[in-house]
Amino acid sequence: ETCEALLDFVKRGDHLILGHGNGPQVGNVMLQHEAGMKVFELPSMPMDFCVSETQGSIGYLIELGFKKVLAKSGINRNVVTLITEVVVDKDDPMFKNPTKPVGPYYSEHDAEEYSKQTGAIFREDPRGRGWRKVVPSPQPIKINNIEIVKSLSEQGNIVVTVGGGGIPVIEKDGYFTGVEAVIDKDLASSLTAIQ
């Protein structure tokens, strides 16, 4: 339905660059990793890895949906998904006060146990639904592959980028490394439009 709603923009010749959320999906990925850790002793993956997984899977679904809508309308346009890193400041104050809830709800006991095992920080849900892991939600500074986004868009491609707000990375020793955080999808999409 969303792809159909955007079809008029495509027909008008607009260049579409799409961002998307991943809230429920990244929570599901975290549960999959947790189950793998408990049942098979597989390593649990960090938040940046989980965001990259959801960028790929949700982007794939958006591509399928858009290609179907385009084909029905007789429009020949490519749809491409980019795994996108978004730079954040390592000194962002949100790293000292994580507040963004992610993943499932836990009992207080289970949250304490999980915290002991992993070092994760939990906060009680204000509505009394349980305890949830919280992570920092720093401000996005730069879209790392913005030049590729621009180039693909200018060539007429529909570009899916900054999924889930982008993979949060910081610059360290001249290269980028992922961090345990989530970026607001609306802020990342706005930054994409500005850059």
Model-derived regions: residue spans:
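Short acidic, glycine/serine/threonine-rich loops at helix termini
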Residues: 27-32, 91-97, 171-174
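N-terminal glycine-/serine-/threonine-rich phosphate-binding loop
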Residues: 1-17, 29-35, 151-155
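Ligand-binding beta-strand-loop-alpha-helix segment within the catalytic cores
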Residues: 36-159
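Short, catalytically relevant binding-site loops at active-site mouths
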Residues: 88, 165-168, 189
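Short beta-strand segments at enzyme active-site cores
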Residues: 15-28, 78-83, 159-162
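Gly/Ser/Thr-rich active-site loops/lids in small-molecule metabolic enzymes
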Residues: 2, 43, 151, 174-195
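Short, basic, glycine/proline-bearing loop/turn elements
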Residues: 1, 128-136, 170-179
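Alpha-helix C-terminal capping segments
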Residues: 8-12, 61-71, 191-195
